Amino acid sequence: MKIVQERFHRASLPNGLRILHQQTRGPICHLAVIIRAGSRDEQEREQGLAHFVEHCLFKGTAHRKTYHILSRLDDIGGELNAFTGKEDTTLYATVLDPYFRRAAELLVDIAFHSTFPEREIGKEKEVVVDEIQAYADSPSDHIFDLFDELIFSDHPLGRNILGTPKSVRSFSRNHLLEFTTRLYRTDRIVLATAGPLSGEKVERVWSTLFDDILPERSTLERKGAGAHKAVHAQKETAQSQTHCILGNRAFGGEEDHSLAFHLLNNILGGPTMNNRLNLRIRERFGLTYHLESFYTPYTDVGCWGVYFSTEPGHSERVVRLVHKELKELRERALGTLQLSRAKKQVQGQIALAQENAGSSVGSAARSLLHRGSIEPLEQIMERIDRISATELLEVANQVFEPTALSSIYLRGQGST
């Protein structure tokens, strides 16, 4: 499959910050500061701190109060936001191209000059506790956090990104300062942008904004996930439906089989209407509305599972039908036409995702941040073309082995 990839402009500032820019034709500029500081980088008593820091970055800097931070881009119709993941934190902005420098300067101010006022920290604790409770009240969200805890046990990847009410309420200003001093270092940050400006102009803008930021290197190493055995858990709820995840650890993003497993997961229950779980369980039997499989590859390990919600009386039948589909993928190789269709489908999905410039450069920036390189789109397509039916059988037997699957149930009470 022949696809021409738009080139990225890459550069490094003297202090070690890396720049990645994708030039586009439209008037919109996307900017992001992506920091290699996620929830897996928290120490044992810091659960939820990466996310809490992200919230508090907007509460005041050496140059601005909260109102001025929030109004700086709102006043020109722009967008400013942030999110925290297991492996990184992202601060991002979207503006019309005349306001590129304004957005870049604001992101630098937030990321490098936040003061974390004590009064604002106290108020934000209750905001985050409310966020935690909102997720706990949503079983379709909460079960994914419980599943992570199940398969990663006491490893940082198993911790809830939001933390717990107790951990969040324990944070002080010193905790936030220690965390950012330890992890918000220049060699752990990529500045990602997309827009009509040239790469050279973008580089000049960033250069003028970092005159006072000295190079800081980090020697911190991440803890490996270790061994895993299947674990099963269940919890009674007051909800009407039963929610369930069956799953296992899978391949990390740096492992050879990760792309083949991405293809396999797409066949099983990916974001398409013709995936096997949808056609053979939802459409054929009408047992569930929400049924999907997911695959999250972190740098060194992955997380895979099948999630569904259904009437309590249907849950065991759905589980049996899911196991039937997994068994078929372990034992029966895809035919030539089936494999060709599956490859074209996932290649199309990947190519279409590149049309969103902000998403495209963000994905490339994360690859640069975590792996030190960016794989060209053309090379990804060629690797997909080389995936064989035999390799799919191999990865299916490694991950879909019945005795290796963990499960978590949030059992409902049925209709009232």
Residue map of PLM features:
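Short acidic/glycine-enriched loop/turn segments that link adjacent beta-strands
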Residues: 5, 27, 87-88, 240, ...
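N- or domain-start disorder-to-order transition segments that initiate the globular core
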Residues: 1-28
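Active/ligand-binding-proximal structured segments within catalytic/core domains
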Residues: 16, 23-73, 147, 184, ...
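Short gly/ser/thr-rich secondary-structure transition/capping motifs
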Residues: 4, 174, 227-228
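Charge-rich, well-structured scaffold segments of protease-associated domains
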Residues: 12, 66-224, 244, 251-252, ...
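His/Glu-based metal-binding/catalytic segments typifying zinc-dependent metallopeptidases
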Residues: 23-25, 32-34, 217-275, 409
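Short, conserved active-site loop motifs that form the nucleotide-linked donor/cofactor pocket
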Residues: 8, 17, 189, 232, ...
